[in-house]
């Protein structure tokens, strides 16, 4: 499974949004209705799923689904 698909599944599960709304350009706050607590929980779930730690200063830069996917992809390089 591609990283985008894994991230998308986590977002759909955690936020209860329609999978069609989860695109790389989708903003967690503006498009998916996430608040800061939702985003913190998403970051923790991504850390668990991908076996990594996302520093707070990096987590603050994750505003869109694409940001999250790019962060994960860069870890794997």
From Swiss-Prot:
GO terms for cellular component: cytosol; membrane. It holds the Pfam family PP-binding. InterPro entries: ACP, ACP-like_sf, PP-bd_ACP, Ppantetheine_attach_site. GO terms for molecular function: acyl binding; acyl carrier activity. One of its GO terms (biological process) is lipid A biosynthetic process. Coiled coil: none annotated. SUPFAM superfamilies: ACP-like. Residues 1-76 form the Carrier domain. It comes from the Bacteria. Keywords: Cytoplasm, Fatty acid biosynthesis, Fatty acid metabolism, Lipid biosynthesis, Lipid metabolism, Phosphopantetheine, Phosphoprotein. Pathway: Lipid metabolism; fatty acid biosynthesis. 4'-phosphopantetheine is transferred from CoA to a specific serine of apo-ACP by AcpS. This modification is essential for activity because fatty acids are bound in thioester linkage to the sulfhydryl of the prosthetic group. It is found in: Cytoplasm. The keyword Lipid metabolism applies. The modification O-(pantetheine 4'-phosphoryl)serine is found at residue 36. Carrier of the growing fatty acid chain in fatty acid biosynthesis. Belongs to the acyl carrier protein (ACP) family. This is Acyl carrier protein. It comes from Staphylococcus carnosus (strain TM300). The gene is acpP.
């Amino acid at each position: 499974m591609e990283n985008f698909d894994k991230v998308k599944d986590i977002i759909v599960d955690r936020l209860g949004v329609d999978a069609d709304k989860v695109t790389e350009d989708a903003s967690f706050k503006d498009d998916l209705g996430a608040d800061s607590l939702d985003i913190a929980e998403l970051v923790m779930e991504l850390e668990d799923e991908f076996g990594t730690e996302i520093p707070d200063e990096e987590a603050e830069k994750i505003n869109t689904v694409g940001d999250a996917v790019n962060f994960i992809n860069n870890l794997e390089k």
